[in-house]
């Protein structure tokens, strides 16, 4: 199911991300959701329709297991885009009446149907911590899969980025859908390869699907959505002209390059996010702080949206192929134009109405992009976000996929009741 076959539009594509004659249909947030979807896979082709709210496809609530990754809690303030995505999806599905159980780490939001399986495992910075985390996560995902196998679920949504749920999926009667949020990495790839022939995988952008095509020839694409009410439109920036950068403060996000680019453009910069890599902070960020560069801390969702909406421009400086670009989507939803390195999915999000792209890792070119982006029309930014990133549409698409997977799974009375067929 995809996002963007061109720089200027997002498509829904169910079928190979690359290959012959994929069935495509433009599905913007403002377009009637009546398209027919089809795909070619080893198992029977999926044919499903989008209703104004796809939850109407279910006669009764569905019992859904969501397997989160365990490194950080699924709670505000979010450590990153995956935590926010998992939180919103669980919340939205529960709001639609489904019975959601979220398997996640301690500290996650309790009213999401939480089953807390371990303390947050965090990120590794050396071989010893990596080995410790690997062991903790393996034991935790074993416990999760034991519970899922006994839980009587209709569908399992796997957001874990861990191979073990994939390798044990055959032990579960319910079908599993696995979302791809990152480029291929070991050992997750081992699990994906093991189930590539008989499981549905959905990447969060077309560019990410293309990266996975080397090991997974037919990934679907379901683009991420954002809460357009939380990231509300702000027609006028606040205060003196300034830029903002948000995200995890880690080398692959490149905040040190954003600082240098803002200075090159002559704009003060404020930035926010968790200090996820102390060594990187001490060596590359702390020495760059000054009167024109201010660290705001790790902000709540509401405070983050307010500060983004007040800014004159957002910088996005990834040093990897950005799988989706959630920061970009949130910024334009607030009406704040974006200057960004043209990496990964970002060129699929930004067009000339809402952002300016720069050459990857080129600080001077990013400074140029900052100067040009400041003058873009804020309402055009918001309209672009509304067209591409309505989270309710994302939820519709996942519901439609769940329904199709349940239809093609081994029939059970529980599935039939949920679909209104018993």
Predicted feature residues:
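Short alpha-helix boundary/capping segments
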Residues: 1-8
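Catalytic cores of nucleotide-sugar-dependent glycosyltransferases that transfer UDP/GDP/TDP-activated
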Residues: 21, 28, 33-40, 44, ...
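Short, composition-biased linear "edge" segments at structural boundaries
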Residues: 14, 22-23
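N-terminal, intrinsically disordered, basic low-complexity segments enriched in Arg/Pro/Ser/Thr
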Residues: 8-17
């Amino acid at each position: 199911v995809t996002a963007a076959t061109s720089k200027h539009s997002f498509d829904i594509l169910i079928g190979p991300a690359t290959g012959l004659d994929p069935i495509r249909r433009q599905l913007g947030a403002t377009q009637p959701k009546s398209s027919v979807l089809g795909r070619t896979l080893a198992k029977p082709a999926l044919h499903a329709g989008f209703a104004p709210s796809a939850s109407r496809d279910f006669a009764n609530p569905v019992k859904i297991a969501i397997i989160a990754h365990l490194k950080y809690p699924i709670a505000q303030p979010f450590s990153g885009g995956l935590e926010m995505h998992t939180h919103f999806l669980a919340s939205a599905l529960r709001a639609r009446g489904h019975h959601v159980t979220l398997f996640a780490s301690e500290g996650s939001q309790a009213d999401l149907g939480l089953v807390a399986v371990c303390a947050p495992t965090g990120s590794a910075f050396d071989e010893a911590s990596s080995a410790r985390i690997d062991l903790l996560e393996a034991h935790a995902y074993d416990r999760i899969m034991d519970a899922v196998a006994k839980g009587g679920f209709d569908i399992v949504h796997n957001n874990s980025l861990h191979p073990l749920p994939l390798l044990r999926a055959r032990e579960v009667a319910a079908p599993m859908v696995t979302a791809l949020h990152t480029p291929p990495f070991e050992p997750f790839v081992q699990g994906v390869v093991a189930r590539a022939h008989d499981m549905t995988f959905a990447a969060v952008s077309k560019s990410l699907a293309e990266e996975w095509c080397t090991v997974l020839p037919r990934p679907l694409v379901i683009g991420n959505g954002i809460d357009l009410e939380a990231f509300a439109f702000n027609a006028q920036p606040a205060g003196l002209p300034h830029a903002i950068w948000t995200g995890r403060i880690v080398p692959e996000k490149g905040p040190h390059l954003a600082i240098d680019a803002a200075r090159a453009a002559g704009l003060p910069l404020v930035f926010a996010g968790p200090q996820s890599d102390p060594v990187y902070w001490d060596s590359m960020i702390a020495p760059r702080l000054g009167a024109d560069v201010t660290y705001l801390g790790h902000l709540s969702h509401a405070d983050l949206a307010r500060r983004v909406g007040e800014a004159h421009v957002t910088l996005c400086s990834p040093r990897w192929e950005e799988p989706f670009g959630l920061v970009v989507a949130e910024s334009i939803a607030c009406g704040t134009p974006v200057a960004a390195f043209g990496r990964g999915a970002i060129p699929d999000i930004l067009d000339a109405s809402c952002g300016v792209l720069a050459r990857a890792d080129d600080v001077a070119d990013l400074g140029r992009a900052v100067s040009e982006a400041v003058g873009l029309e804020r309402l055009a930014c918001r309209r672009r976000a509304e067209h591409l990133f309505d989270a309710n549409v994302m939820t519709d698409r996942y519901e439609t996929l769940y329904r199709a997977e349940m239809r093609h799974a081994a029939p059970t009375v529980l599935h039939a009741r949920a679909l209104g067929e018993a």
